[in-house]
From Swiss-Prot:
Belongs to the IspH family. This is 4-hydroxy-3-methylbut-2-enyl diphosphate reductase. The active site is at residue 187. Catalyzes the conversion of 1-hydroxy-2-methyl-2-(E)-butenyl 4-diphosphate (HMBPP) into a mixture of isopentenyl diphosphate (IPP) and dimethylallyl diphosphate (DMAPP). Acts in the terminal step of the DOXP/MEP pathway for isoprenoid precursor biosynthesis. [4Fe-4S] cluster binds at residues 66, 157, 288. Keywords: 4Fe-4S, Iron, Iron-sulfur, Isoprene biosynthesis, Metal-binding, Oxidoreductase. Dimethylallyl diphosphate binds at residues 96, 185, 317-319, 380. Gene3D superfamilies: 3.40.50.11270, 4-hydroxy-3-methylbut-2-enyl diphosphate reductase, catalytic domain (3.40.1010.20). It comes from Prochlorococcus marinus (strain SARG / CCMP1375 / SS120). The keyword Iron applies. Isopentenyl diphosphate binds at residues 96, 185, 317-319, 380. Its cofactor is [4Fe-4S] cluster. GO terms for molecular function: 4 iron, 4 sulfur cluster binding; 4-hydroxy-3-methylbut-2-enyl diphosphate reductase activity; metal ion binding. Pathway: Isoprenoid biosynthesis; dimethylallyl diphosphate biosynthesis; dimethylallyl diphosphate from (2E)-4-hydroxy-3-methylbutenyl diphosphate: step 1/1; Isoprenoid biosynthesis; isopentenyl diphosphate biosynthesis via DXP pathway; isopentenyl diphosphate from 1-deoxy-D-xylulose 5-phosphate: step 6/6.
Length: 405
C-alpha cells in the first residue's frame, strides 16, 4: 500500500482534522485550568527546590507534560466541547496517564475495546467522531475509520509523524527499517504499519544479535523464531538485512537508540566497506527532543545527594519506565508510582511497580531525620499530579515527625 498517497488523501478529507477547533490561547487556558500547579511553578522559580521542615525536594529540571502530550490532551477535550452530543470514540488511551484517561471517560468519550490485542470497531458508526491518540494509529485503523465515514480527530504527536516519514523514506529507497522499540507498544505498531520491510529490536542485546547474524554468526531458524512477532510478514534475514535504516519509538532511551544506530553503521561498514556504506545504511535522527530533555534532566538529578527518588507516570508509559531505569542504574532507592494515592500517609508505605514486576508495597517508605527526595515525572503526567505527590510527602514527613516527638 502507498501509505504516503493514503495520508495525502486523508488529510484533504473534510472529515479529517489535525489542527483542533480552538485558538492556541483558549486551548492553553483550558489546559492550565485543568492541570497546572502554582506550587510546581513556585518550585521551578526556586531552582527546582522545595525545603519544608525535614524534607528537601529536588525536582528534575525537565519533567511532566511535553508539547505533544499537551496538544493531544487539549485537542481531545476541545473535541467534546465542539461535538457536545455526538458519539466520540478514542482508539486507545490518549496518553499513558490514568487520571487523564479517566477524565475523558467522565466526558463520555468511549474507548475502543480490544481482545488479545485486536481492537473491535464494530460499534463505531458512520458520522461518529473518533480521536487518534498521541501515539498515532495504524494505517489499517485510519483506513477503516475513513471508509466508514467517521470524523477523524488526529492528535498524533508531530515527532511520531516524523518517524513515520523516516520509515516511509526507507521503504521508498528499498531499505529495511530497524525500529528500536517495544513490539506491542501503540506507537511502534503504528510506525511499523507505515514501514515496508521492518524488524523491531527491543534493546542493544537484540540489536547485537541481529548484527552478529549480518556478519555470518547466527542461525537462520533461531533468528526467525526469535523475531517471528517482531518483523514484517515474510521477513527474510538473508535478503532483508542487506540495506538498513534505523528509526525508533520516540520514548525509548536516547543513549541506547544512538548506540544501536552506531552498531548497525559499524556492522554495515565492516561487511561492505566505506565505499559502499551509503548503499547499505541510512543515518537517522528520530529522537524526540522532549524525551531527550527529560532523560538528560534525570541524569543530572541522580547526581544530586538523594536518599530516595519518586518517578511518577503510568505503569505502561515507556518514557517513564526509562526514567526509572536511569535511577536504578545509579543505585538510588527509587519508586515508580502512577498516582499520588500510592503513598500511604498513615502507614508510611508506598505501593510501587518495580521494573518488570508486579505492584509491591514498601514499608517504612520515608526514613527518619532529614531527607532528600528527588522527583521526576513522565511526559504524560500533569503538574497537578506532581503537586499532589509532593503534598503527600510533606504530610507524611510532618506526621512521622510528630510521631517521633
Amino acid at each position: 500500500m502507498d501509505t504516503q498517497a493514503f495520508k495525502r488523501s486523508l488529510h484533504h478529507s473534510d472529515r479529517y482534522n489535525r489542527r483542533g477547533f480552538e485558538s492556541p490561547a483558549k486551548r492553553a487556558q483550558a489546559l492550565e485550568k485543568a492541570y497546572q500547579s502554582n506550587l510546581i511553578a513556585s518550585i521551578r522559580d526556586n531552582g527546582y527546590l522545595l525545603e519544608h521542615g525535614r524534607l528537601r525536594v529536588k525536582l528534575a529540571e525537565a519533567f511532566g507534560f511535553c508539547w505533544g502530550v499537551e496538544r493531544a490532551v487539549a485537542m481531545a477535550y476541545e473535541t467534546r466541547r465542539h461535538y457536545p452530543t455526538e458519539s466520540i470514540w478514542i482508539t486507545n488511551e490518549i496518553i499513558h496517564n490514568p487520571s487523564v484517561n479517566d477524565h475523558l471517560r467522565n466526558m463520555n468519550v468511549r474507548f475502543i475495546s480490544a481482545e488479545k490485542g485486536i481492537k473491535d470497531f464494530s460499534s463505531v458508526e458512520e458520522g461518529d467522531v473518533v480521536i487518534l491518540p498521541a501515539f498515532g494509529a495504524t494505517v489499517h485503523e485510519m483506513k477503516l475509520l475513513h471508509e466508514r465515514g467517521c470524523h477523524i480527530i488526529d492528535t498524533t504527536c508531530p515527532w511520531v509523524s516524523k518517524v513515520w516519514h523516516t520509515v516511509e523514506k526507507h521503504k521508498k529507497h528499498e531499505f529495511s527499517s530497524i525500529i528500536h522499540g517495544k513490539v506491542k507498544h501503540e506507537e511502534t505498531l503504528a510506525t511499523s504499519s507505515f514501514a515496508g520491510t521492518y524488524l523491531v529490536v527491543l534493546d542493544l542485546k537484540e540489536a547485537q544479535y541481529v548484527s552478529d547474524y549480518i556478519l555470518g554468526k547466527g542461525n537462520r531458524d533461531d533468528f526467525l523464531r526469535r523475531f517471528s512477532r517482531a518483523s514484517s510478514q515474510g521477513f527474510d534475514p538473508d535478503r532483508d538485512l542487506k540495506r538498513l535504516g534505523v528509526a525508533n519509538q520516540t520514548t525509548m532511551l536516547k543513549s541506547e537508540t544512538e548506540e544501536i544506530g552506531r552498531l548497525f553503521e559499524k556492522t554495515m561498514l565492516r561487511k561492505y566497506g566505506p565505499a559502499e556504506l551509503n548503499e547499505h545504511f541510512l543515518a537517522f535522527n528520530t529522537i524526540c527532543d522532549a524525551t531527550e530533555e527529560r532523560q538528560d534532566a534525570m541524569f543530572s538529578l541522580v547526581d544530586e545527594p538523594l536518599d530516595l527518588l519518586v518517578v511518577i507516570g503510568g505503569f505502561n508509559s515507556s518514557n517513564t519506565t526509562h526514567l526509572q531505569e536511569i535511577a536504578l542504574a545509579k543505585g538510588i532507592r527509587s519508586f515508580h508510582i502512577d498516582t499520588p494515592e500510592r503513598i500511604g500517609e498513615i502507614e508510611n508505605t508506598i505501593t510501587h511497580k518495580p521494573l518488570g514486576d508486579d505492584l509491591r508495597v514498601e514499608s517504612n517508605f520515608l526514613p527518619e531525620g532529614k531527607i532528600n527526595v528527588g522527583i521526576t515525572s513522565g511526559a504524560s503526567t500533569p503538574d497537578r499530579i506532581v503537586e499532589h505527590v509532593i503534598q503527600k510527602l510533606i504530610n507524611l514527613s510532618e506526621r512521622k515527625l510528630m510521631t517521633e516527638n
